[in-house]
């Protein structure tokens, strides 16, 4: 993880740690001139590691985004941001996306009153995300919310911290994406691969 954040910069979904300010400068001096391919590859890797996806999963999302109406890059980011594990992370119910993924796979999370154990579940507007009524599930979320620093909640989500309940209001707007990334470079990377 630390090698990844040192090379690619801060990845809030992967870890809460930040690279030291001097390490960025050292990397640029050591590496010399960066090729266009390397720039595209680094943007793609940033996206992949932040959301915790395999190469195959990311490629699948790029294909879905390419077939949808609108800008491929914007649609790609919307698809990734509306994943259940990412929504839990953005609501502050988990400190990282891998932590949120673990909550989902261990069946602690309900969507609209039904257990969902698939982290890639695509949330829709008006979905209600809650924890199971079991004490252990509530305790896990309580630990996460108490320990994690509270960032500003995106406007497409609302949370009720007392009932451990989150609501998806709408599809995310591009300015609320939690990662600084040039999504067009990712799309270009894949368009040149095929």
Swiss-Prot record:
GO terms for biological process: ribosomal small subunit biogenesis; translation. Keywords: Chloroplast, Plastid, Ribonucleoprotein, Ribosomal protein, RNA-binding, rRNA-binding. Signal peptide: none annotated. GO terms for cellular component: chloroplast; small ribosomal subunit. CDD domains: S4. Residues 82-143 form the S4 RNA-binding domain. Its main location: plastid. One of its GO terms (molecular function) is structural constituent of ribosome. It is found in: Plastid, Chloroplast. Part of the 30S ribosomal subunit. Contacts protein S5. The interaction surface between S4 and S5 is involved in control of translational fidelity. One of the primary rRNA binding proteins, it binds directly to 16S rRNA where it nucleates assembly of the body of the 30S subunit. PANTHER family: 30S 40S RIBOSOMAL PROTEIN, SMALL RIBOSOMAL SUBUNIT PROTEIN US4M. Belongs to the universal ribosomal protein uS4 family. HAMAP family: Ribosomal_uS4_B. This is Small ribosomal subunit protein uS4c. It comes from Bobartia gladiata.
């Amino acid at each position: 993880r630390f090698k990844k954040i040192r090379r690619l910069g801060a990845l809030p979904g992967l870890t809460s740690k930040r690279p030291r300010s001097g390490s960025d400068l050292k990397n640029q001096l050591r590496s010399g001139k960066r090729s266009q391919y390397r720039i595209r590859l680094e943007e793609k890797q940033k996206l992949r590691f932040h959301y915790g996806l395999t190469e195959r999963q990311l490629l699948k999302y790029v294909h879905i985004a390419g077939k949808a109406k609108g800008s491929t890059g914007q649609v790609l980011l919307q698809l990734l941001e509306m994943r259940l594990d990412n929504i839990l992370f953005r609501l502050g119910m988990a400190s990282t996306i891998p932590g949120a993924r673990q909550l989902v796979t261990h069946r602690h999370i309900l969507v609209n009153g039904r257990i969902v154990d698939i982290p890639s579940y695509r949330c829709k507007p008006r979905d209600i995300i809650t924890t199971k009524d079991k004490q252990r599930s509530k305790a896990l979320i309580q630990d996460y919310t108490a320990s994690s620093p509270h960032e500003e909640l995106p406007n497409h989500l609302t949370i009720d911290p007392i009932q451990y309940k989150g609501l998806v209001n709408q599809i995310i707007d591009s300015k609320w994406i939690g990662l600084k990334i040039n999504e067009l470079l990712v799309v270009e990377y894949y368009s040149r691969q095929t």
